[in-house]
Amino acid sequence: MQKGAKIEDEGRQSRIQSRNFIIQRSDPRTRGSSVYSSRSSSYNVRSSISPGVYQQLSSSGITDFKGNREKEKREMQNLNERLASYIEKVHFLDAQVKKLEAENEALRNRKVEDLQPIRDAYENELRQARKVIDELASSKGVAEGKLAGLQDEIGSLRELIVTYESQAKDYRKKIDSLGNQLGEFEGELQSLRLRVGSLEDENAKLRELLEKVQEQNRRLRADLDTETAAHIEADCLAQTKTEEAEFYRDLLDQLELLKPEPIQIKGMDYADFWKSELAKCVREINLAYDEKIDLIQQDCEAKYASQINQLRSGNVKDGMQLQHSQEEVKKLRGQLQDKNAAYAELATRIASLQAERDELARQLADIERELEEQKLKYNRDVGDLESELTSVLAQLQHLMDAKMSLELEIACYKKLLEGEESRVGLRTLVEQAIGTQSKGSASLKDAIQSSS
């Protein structure tokens, strides 16, 4: 290859010729004289100008001269820099031309070597590369099949995740509805408790009223018993007084029978007198006693009648109130029993709803845990598959690059061996072949090592 490059370089000759640049600079003294002459001429011209105008023109001329001088210096510096860079470039190109001429001469003097071992080596490497490519293609097919299966599994897992999420949403809605229903039941239970408390307060008030009525009835009965005893005592007293009066009558009758014969006083009847006086006294006593007994009897009868009437009216009223209170108590007891039964039923319902809510929460937690596990497993599988796919694609790209470099190298060697190359661009092909040889051999070596 080097000999071919030398032969190609012989057909080309360097057309770059060395160039010489001469920079002439005037002497400062001559420049000063020229400036002096220009100044003298300008002085002769300006001598006819007034002093103020001359001063203005001289200051503007000095400013223009300084500006032109600075501009010329910058231009000269730029030209010097460009010249120095151009000279360096010319020296570099001359050295490169000499180097290329030396390489061309070395390639001309080099003998043609046998390229058959190189061809065999590259064909062997190419066969190995093709074998590796076929193996990787088969493994790629297996990996693609496995990837398709995993993608199907991922799709099924996604559908399962969607199903679990929908079920979780349904469970959440059901839990929310049960929570709302439970709140309604708790509110109703609280209202029932308040109603039961108010009914218990009313029942306590009615009990107090009933106790007061019963106490009043007991007092009235005690008063009735007292009045009855007093009436009986008065009856007994009246009976006693009546018997006493009868006794006194009998006694008087007996006294009349047993009295001695009255002394007859002439002109005066003492028996009739005492009899009439005694009868008069007895009548007065009987009248006074009867009046007193009648008054006592009337008073007792009136008092007893009024008390009896009061007791009767009070008993009727108390009986009606007592009956009404008993009916109200029975009604309240029935309502309390109904509320207690409803409270027990609501407590049972709340307990069952809480148990159902706990069960649904547990099922939801299990489903969420399974969903998280499935997600983690899915993410791990996807990460593993992506890493595996990335490595397979990298190996495939590596092998494709190696294959392309080997094909280019083989094409170059075929052209060299078959003698179809032209002199124009031969050195470029040789350099490309040398570069791709090293790159292709290194890539093929890495691919074989990684596949093995």
UniProtKB/Swiss-Prot annotation:
Region (Coil 1B): 122-259
SUPFAM superfamilies named among the record's database cross-references: Intermediate filament protein, coiled coil region, Tropomyosin
Region: Disordered, residue numbers: 1-50
GO terms (BP aspect): heterochromatin formation; nuclear envelope organization; nuclear migration; nuclear pore localization; protein localization to nuclear envelope
SMART domains: Filament
Biased composition regions of type Basic and acidic residues, renumbered to the chain: 1-13
Alphabetized Pfam families for the sequence: Filament
Segments for region (Coil 2): 279-424
Region (Coil 1A): 76-111
GO CC list: intermediate filament; nuclear envelope; nuclear lamina
Biased composition annotated in UniProt, kind: Low complexity: 33-50
Head: region residues: 1-75
Annotated ranges, domain IF rod: 72-424
UniProt protein name: Retrograde protein of 51 kDa
UniProt source species: Lymnaea stagnalis (Great pond snail)
